[in-house]
Amino acid sequence: MTYENLDVKLVNELLGDGRASLRSLADDLDVSVTTVSNHLQTLEDEGAVNGYTPVVDYERLGYDVTAILQLKVDGTALPEITGTLRGHKQMVSVYEITGDYDVLAIGKFTDTDDMNTLIKELLADADINESSTSVVLNAAAENEQFELDLDGDA
């Protein structure tokens, strides 16, 4: 077997089963365990593969409310505000964005009271000029990952 696209094939195998053993990956990819180990180590060292985490169903664990927060922030305070949001365990995604708002954050909450507590805390910050909150009614797709193309095309 040639090693062309081996890293892409390895990532795709891991997307299918992040707990696969080096032996099973080697068998599936028709290469040696050492080759898989070396390529995987390189992917980890380069930051292309960052850990092996379970996909958690927060709703099953009592986090029934997903909220999307959009914030207008004083420009110089952007790093501070995004850092504050990242510091809250319920915030699963925090983005600096273009458009009408500066920050978009997605959070998981046990109920609307839990959500409101965080929103009130955030709005007490003078650097947040405006906010908009939407509650997700139904997650049509969430935490989706996609297989990489073998030819390098997106």
From Swiss-Prot:
Location of the HTH asnC-type domain: 3-64
GO molecular function: sequence-specific DNA binding
Pfam families (UniProt xref): AsnC_trans_reg, HTH_24
Keywords: Activator, DNA-binding, Repressor, Transcription, Transcription regulation
GO biological process, one term: response to amino acid
Signal peptide feature range: none
Record-linked SUPFAM superfamilies: Dimeric alpha+beta barrel, Winged helix' DNA-binding domain
Gene3D superfamilies, per the entry: 3.30.70.920, Winged helix-like DNA-binding domain superfamily/Winged helix DNA-binding domain (1.10.10.10)
Residue ranges the UniProt entry marks as DNA-binding: 22-41
Top-level division of the source organism's lineage: Archaea
GO cellular component, one term: cytosol
Entry-linked InterPro entries: ArsR-like_HTH (IPR011991), AsnC-type_HTH_dom (IPR000485), Dimeric_a/b-barrel (IPR011008), HTH_trans_regulator_Lrp (IPR053535), Tscrpt_reg_AsnC-like (IPR019888), Tscrpt_reg_AsnC/Lrp_C (IPR019887), WH-like_DNA-bd_sf (IPR036388), WH_DNA-bd_sf (IPR036390)
Function: Transcription factor that regulates multiple target genes, including those encoding enzymes involved in amino acid synthesis, central metabolism, transport processes and other regulators of transcription. Acts both as an activator and as a repressor of transcription.
PANTHER family to which the protein is assigned, alphabetical: LEUCINE-RESPONSIVE REGULATORY PROTEIN, TRANSCRIPTIONAL REGULATOR AZLB
Protein name (database record): HTH-type transcriptional regulator Lrp
Organism of this sequence: Halobacterium salinarum (strain ATCC 29341 / DSM 671 / R1)
Gene name per UniProt: lrp
